[in-house]
Amino acid sequence: MSLAAYCVICCRRVGTSTSPPKSGTRWRDIRNIIKFTGSLILGGSLFLTYEVLALKKAVTLDTQVVEREKMKSYIYVHTVSLDKGENHGIAWQARKELHKAVRKVLATSAKILRNPFADPFSTVDIEDHECAVWLLLRKSKSDDKTTRLEAVQEMSEAHHWHDYQYRLIAQACDPKTLIGLARSKESDLRFFLLPPPLPSLKEDSSTEEELRQLLASLPQTELDECIQYFTSLALSESSQSLAAQKGGLWCFGGNGLPYAESFGEVPSATVEMFCLEAIVKHSEISTHCDKIEANGGLQLLQRLYQLHKDCPKVQRNIMRIIGNMALNEHLHSSIVRSGWVSIMAEAMKSDRIMEASHAARILANLDRETVQEKYQDGVYVLHPQYRTSRPIKADVLFIHGLMGAAFKTWRQQDSEQAVIEKPMEEEDRYTTCWPKTWLAKDCPALRIISVEYDTTLSDWRARCPMERRSLLSISSGIGEVLESPLHSEATNFLGSSELLVLGIGRWFGYHIAWEVFSSKRCCWKPLRSQK
């Protein structure tokens, strides 16, 4: 009995230990499922959030960058300093942050006090080595004329900048600053960009044909007889007809003889010289200058200038045309945009006095900041050709004689001794224009002007058969050339100095000077006359 009871108790214990309660198993499974599902949901949410933010960042445009790049759209690659000590260390970082803080203080005070550099300077995070460049740019656009001139002077004296800093100035400055740099003696040529690409020529066309079309597009009515003659002669000639008629012109002494003598040894430039001579006459009329600009004449003349670098006569006529167009202030922006300022800035530094003088006339007519006068065709300033703060005490006017020219008359006589045998001191003293070289050096306060007019023995019956030259007509023409219209009044630009001195070439030059300065319209009168 007792054995049976013991067996029953043992069986109950075994049954109780092997069959756990079902409710505990169910809650354990639920907890495991919750943990797995929660981890999956949380990880998926984080992943989706990251992808959405990354996609939003990729497709969103930072407008602050666009505003910042408005002032730095032309900046070239920055150079890295070779001194590693400047790029590392706490001291360098502190100095950089201090400079930024100072600039912010200056910008804030500029806004309050309305300083000239307030707006652009305060909105751009400019590096330390660029502050001077941007301040000079802002200073060059000041409303105060003295401030602008000082900025241009400081730019011209900068010779330690990197290439990209010169290009930055060239691309960001206004036309007045660019012209001022071109007329500054010490300016670096890196300030001037290359001229814009020239438009391509039309199919089956040439520069000769384009030049003839430009000449034909100019007004042909109400013209002087000589202008009509030059125009008709240029339009009627071509390379083939000129070759066929050349013998006749020489044999019978026609009007083509002076042309044939002036063409030099460049046959390809012969017909172009005909057209350029005619366009020079047209460019003396203001309305015709507008037509030349509207019909692409500035670009075409630039193409000819580049093609005939070895032909000074072609280049001289082209510069005469540009100089005449520069007399019209409303064409200044077109002349600057076409790249002529860069070309003339390089020509100003030429060793050839004639080329430099033509370029100086063009830039002086473009410069309305420091030059009040306008130099007509045939008037060349030999000194000063650059901007100067020195006041002009006297004008020296050189008028050449019958067989002379504006530059040829005043050259030094060639020495019979060979150049190799000359001492170095003698070579240094030699000059092709002594008023520009010697007189300007001895008397820097002078303005030295040379006047050119047509004068060869054959020009008594000039290249234009309808023109009759006389002493009175020549002097009258020079008197008109020396008169420069300022605003609405016709005044004589020589009247701005205290004294006038004449440099006269022989007897003929003396009589021309007498006729010019004894006329009623001339404000200058000789102090003493000698018979």
From Swiss-Prot:
Belongs to the SERAC1 family. GO terms for cellular component: endoplasmic reticulum; membrane; mitochondrion. Keywords: Endoplasmic reticulum, Lipid biosynthesis, Lipid metabolism, Membrane, Mitochondrion, Phospholipid biosynthesis, Phospholipid metabolism, Transmembrane, Transmembrane helix. The gene is SERAC1. It is found in: Mitochondrion membrane; Endoplasmic reticulum; Mitochondrion. GO terms for biological process: phospholipid biosynthetic process. It is a single-pass membrane protein. SUPFAM superfamilies: ARM repeat. This is Protein SERAC1. The lineage of its organism: Eukaryota, Metazoa, Chordata, Craniata, Vertebrata. The keyword Repressor does not apply. The chain crosses the membrane at residues 33-50. InterPro entries: ARM-like, ARM-type_fold, SERAC1. It comes from Macaca fascicularis. The keyword Lipid metabolism applies. Facilitates the transport of serine from the cytosol to the mitochondria by interacting with and stabilizing Sideroflexin-1 (SFXN1), a mitochondrial serine transporter, playing a fundamental role in the one-carbon cycle responsible for the synthesis of nucleotides needed for mitochondrial DNA replication. Plays an important role in the phosphatidylglycerol (PG) remodeling that is essential for both mitochondrial function and intracellular cholesterol trafficking.
